[in-house]
Structure formats: structure tokens, C-alpha cells
């Protein structure tokens, strides 16, 4: 069986009162980005591969109430199946742990979106200032095979968007607990 699991958490936050956080990739409504890059200029709803983000998280801050909602992927192992296609429906040829994170604003209210395996909509951002048609991937689940997926969902309060991002970053680092990577060569050896 080939599958793609998508989840949407609706909120009562109005799109016009909301600011978004996809760490390292999208802040506020991304309106400072050129029209050729993902932003509210192109669409009010976006989904991205979670490996494009510095942390696999989607979040929203409601400026009217000070409420925040975040979804953080809980995944320790990393695997990726390379694809031969850049757009459309893609059946993955191997194992991947990469899902997606995003948000939906089509009805004027915010929903946070996430799932597995990855989806990029309404456009796929393949390189600087290049948007192409969307992509949806499908993973194979063999008879008797088991897949476990988990995300952390968190509600909190913040006095403004800056505090929301700072609090989310601390929460993310506490949950993910990144460790230094042991490299084969020192910086000096690499520069030599």
C-alpha cells in the first residue's frame, strides 16, 4: 500500500492577526522575500519538507490573544530516498524519515499542517528564487510492516511575536537536544 498521511489542526486564529514560524525558513508572513520565493505574496497556505527548516516545527502566534500553537516532529533517525521527479505525485523508491510542516489559511482562519512523507505545496521551492509545481510523495507500507510517527503539539502564550520565536526556539532545543558532531577533520585541516 502506498500512503501519504496529512494532518491539519484548525484554530480560531484569524489569518490577518497571525504570524508564522518555520525556523530558519519562514518568519511572520515572509513578505520581505521576493515574489519568486515562498511568501504571502504567492499564497496564504504553504507546506515544506521538514529538512528545509532548521528545526522540524511549524508554529503560529495570534497577536490578538497572545496565544501560540506549535507542532514539532519527534524523529531521531534520518533517512532519505532520492527522487527522480521534481513535481507531481512521486512514489518513493526507498525509505525516508522526512515529513512536512506548514500552515493553511484558505478560509481566513489558521490551521497548522503536517504529515509524512513530505509534501511541498502550493509550489515547490527548488533553489533561490525558483518556484515550480507542487510535489506529493508516497511511501510504501508492506504487509505486516509497522510505521510509528509522532509529533509534539504545544499551546502557550507570548507577549509578542519576538517572544514567541524565542520561547519556541528554547522549547525546540530542549526537546531535540542537539549534540555536537564529531568531524573527521578540524577547521584548520579543511582550510589547508
Name each region found by the language model:
Residues 1-192:
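Carbohydrate-recognition beta-sandwich/jelly-roll modules
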Amino acid at each position: 500500500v502506498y500512503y501519504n498521511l496529512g494532518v491539519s489542526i484548525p484554530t480560531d486564529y484569524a489569518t490577518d492577526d497571525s504570524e508564522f514560524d518555520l525556523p530558519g525558513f519562514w518568519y511572520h508572513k515572509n513578505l520581505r522575500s521576493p515574489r519568486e520565493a515562498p511568501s504571502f505574496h504567492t499564497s496564504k497556505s504553504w507546506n515544506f519538507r521538514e529538512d528545509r527548516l532548521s528545526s522540524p516545527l511549524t508554529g503560529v502566534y495570534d497577536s490578538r490573544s497572545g496565544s501560540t500553537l506549535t507542532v514539532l516532529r519527534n524523529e531521531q533517525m534520518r533517512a532519505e530516498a532520492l527522487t527522480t521527479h521534481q513535481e507531481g505525485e512521486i512514489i518513493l523508491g526507498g525509505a525516508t524519515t522526512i515529513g512536512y510542516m506548514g500552515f493553511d489559511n484558505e478560509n481566513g482562519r489558521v490551521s497548522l499542517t503536517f504529515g509524512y512523507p513530505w509534501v511541498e505545496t502550493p509550489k515547490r521551492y527548488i533553489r533561490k528564487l525558483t518556484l515550480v509545481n507542487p510535489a506529493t510523495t508516497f511511501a510504501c507500507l508492506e504487509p505486516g510492516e509497522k510505521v510509528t510517527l509522532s509529533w509534539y503539539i504545544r499551546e502557550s502564550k507570548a507577549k509578542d511575536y519576538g517572544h514567541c520565536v524565542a520561547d519556541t526556539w528554547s522549547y525546540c532545543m530542549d526537546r531535540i537536544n542537539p549534540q555536537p558532531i564529531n568531524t573527521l577533520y578540524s577547521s584548520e585541516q579543511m582550510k589547508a
